[in-house]
């Protein structure tokens, strides 16, 4: 309301279908409404005029079943619609061994500092979302029964796989980059301390008994350590450069837990 020097309103509109799902999201329009209610038709006309486009809205399409999952999204702008360029989703499950729908199974040790490959996930054990972008590029997201992503696969001349490894409490412990996952082979009890591929090409996170991250290691970097107070707030941190100098960074909080 009256957002500009000329006291014009910035008006945006969202349309819903009969099942209360978002069907169109219109780009904002400049209107001399002074906070008054505007009809659907007037907002649509103003949006087309303000954005100089016949289709200044994002359109969403859904499955015709009770799950109502998104199947296609068209971006704002007439060129997307004129050229039938949309973001498309296909919902699948993983296959056993072989093909784009296979996924390695990794087991993280109880201590959380090493892992081993344990074959492949059984057929149908993972939910898979296949995404096809406006240029035809394909990506697969594999999720376990807890909804955690265990693999993101980008399809090209060669597949590029990013694996996400969790401990038995559901904490993310390792992220294996595509180069790391392609070079590791059949990994057995390896981690950042005994494998250069993991140390240089992967992300590592370590947790205490309260599921607080106490160590974080980025690819090719020295680890960062974290220390918490009795309220689970991080008060000390130390990276590799600070460790070489015997230094720690300190964070102070007020009585409401805000950084002081």
Q: What spans do the regions from the language model cover?
A:
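Beta-strand elements of repeat-based all-beta scaffolds
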Residues: 1-260
């Amino acid at each position: 309301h009256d957002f500009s020097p000329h006291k014009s309103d910035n008006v945006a509109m969202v349309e819903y279908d009969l099942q209360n799902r978002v069907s169109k999201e219109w780009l904002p329009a400049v209107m001399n409404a002074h906070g008054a209610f505007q009809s659907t038709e007037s907002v649509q006309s103003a949006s087309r005029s303000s954005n100089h486009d016949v289709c200044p809205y994002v359109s969403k399409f859904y499955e015709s079943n009770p799950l109502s999952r998104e199947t296609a999204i068209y971006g704002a702008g007439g060129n997307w619609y004129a050229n039938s360029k949309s973001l498309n989703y296909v919902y699948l499950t993983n296959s056993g061994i072989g093909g784009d729908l296979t996924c390695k199974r990794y087991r993280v040790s109880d201590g959380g500092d090493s892992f081993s490959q344990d074959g492949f996930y059984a057929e149908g054990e993972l939910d898979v979302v296949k995404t096809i972008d406006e240029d035809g590029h394909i990506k697969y997201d594999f999720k376990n029964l807890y909804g955690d992503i265990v693999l993101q696969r980008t399809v090209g001349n060669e597949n590029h796989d990013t694996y996400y490894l969790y401990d038995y409490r559901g904490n993310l412990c390792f992220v294996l980059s595509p180069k790391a996952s392609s070079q590791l082979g059949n990994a057995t009890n390896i981690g950042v301390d005994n494998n250069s591929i993991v140390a240089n090409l992967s992300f590592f996170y370590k947790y205490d008994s309260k599921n607080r991250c106490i160590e974080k290691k980025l690819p090719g970097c020295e680890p960062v350590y974290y220390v918490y107070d009795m309220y689970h707030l991080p008060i000390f941190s130390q990276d590799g450069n600070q460790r070489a100098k015997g230094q720690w960074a300190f964070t102070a909080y007020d009585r409401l837990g805000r950084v002081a």
